[in-house]
């Protein structure tokens, strides 16, 4: 793939930046806003399927807030890249009750159902300039 490399060596001088990804979330940091998605023609059907197939799973579909089209999935990806990616690495392993997602992308469900593919993510991230190396490396490694 020839990413995370510079002249055959790891970008940033090391293969993993995990030690830099364990910062505690400061008390005065703004909680990133998780985008609200409008219901589409698919949303009602998706909720019915989830309730029928997974009746005993945790959670409710009343607050279903995920993209249901490729266009909105790519929009969610673009929002993550522009608003959250740079801080992702610093707080990648942090847990704090003020937000369930913080700087995470929440793209896994969209990958799992095929609304986006890893190449969509990686190609867009590679175009973004001035990303902190620990965010870049940590996120790309998760996608790969």
What are these regions (language model features)?
Residues 1-69:
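Beta-rich, aromatic/charged-enriched effector core domains that present basic-aromatic interfaces
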């Amino acid at each position: 793939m020839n990413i995370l490399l510079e002249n055959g060596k790891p970008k940033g001088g090391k293969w993993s930046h995990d030690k830099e990804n364990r910062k505690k979330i400061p008390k005065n940091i703004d909680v990133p806003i998780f985008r609200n998605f409008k219901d589409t023609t698919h949303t009602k059907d998706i909720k019915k399927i989830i309730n029928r197939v997974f009746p005993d799973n945790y959670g409710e579909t009343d607050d279903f807030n995920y993209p249901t089209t490729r266009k909105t999935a790519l929009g969610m990806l673009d929002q993550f890249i522009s608003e959250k990616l740079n801080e992702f690495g610093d707080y990648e392993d942090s847990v704090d009750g003020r937000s369930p997602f913080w700087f995470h992308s929440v793209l896994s469900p969209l990958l799992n159902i095929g609304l986006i593919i890893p190449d969509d993510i990686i190609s867009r991230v590679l175009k973004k300039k001035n990303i902190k190396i620990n965010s870049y490396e940590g996120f790309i490694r998760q996608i790969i």
